[in-house]
Design a protein with these regions (language model features):
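Conserved short hydrophobic patches within well-ordered secondary structure
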Residues: 13, 45, 77-79, 107, ...
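A charged, well-structured terminal subsegment
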Residues: 102-124
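General small-molecule cofactor/ligand-binding pocket signal
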Residues: 6, 79, 101
């Protein structure tokens, strides 16, 4: 699986450069994403702009990844999801379980807001 990672002060922006995200790619996705939870910068914005097709197992795996990130007090936001991928996730009843932003910029905003929420939550 081909992807590009850009790291900023608060998050990793990862763009998957494949037309299909399927179950047989989830191990590679884990190998890329799970080690990031051990770094100082843990938050991830996953850009799915190039993904044209996703199968149910891959969609379910994204939900599990997101859950793993939130359990570790880290953000996991999908962005730039194509309409056909959105429809596939919705048909599998997964769309509402995922944190999705229309653009990468809006995903960054979500990460920043969640960081503020975590900081405020820690202060009480």
């Amino acid at each position: 699986m081909q992807f590009k990672i850009d790291t900023s002060e608060k998050f990793h922006a990862i763009k998957i450069k494949e037309p299909v995200l399927s179950a047989n790619m989830t191990a590679e996705l884990d190998a890329c994403l799970m080690p990031l939870l051990q770094q100082d910068v843990k938050n991830v914005v996953l850009n799915l702009q190039d993904i044209q097709t996703i199968d149910n197992a891959a969609g379910e795996h994204l939900v599990k990844l997101q859950h793993s990130y939130y359990e570790q007090s880290a953000s996991f936001v999908l962005c730039c999801v194509q309409k056909q991928v959105e429809k596939a996730l919705d048909a599998a009843d997964l769309l509402e379980l995922l944190n999705i932003a229309p653009t990468e910029s809006e995903a960054w905003d979500i990460v920043h807001m969640e960081e503020i929420e975590r900081e405020l939550g820690d202060s009480f």
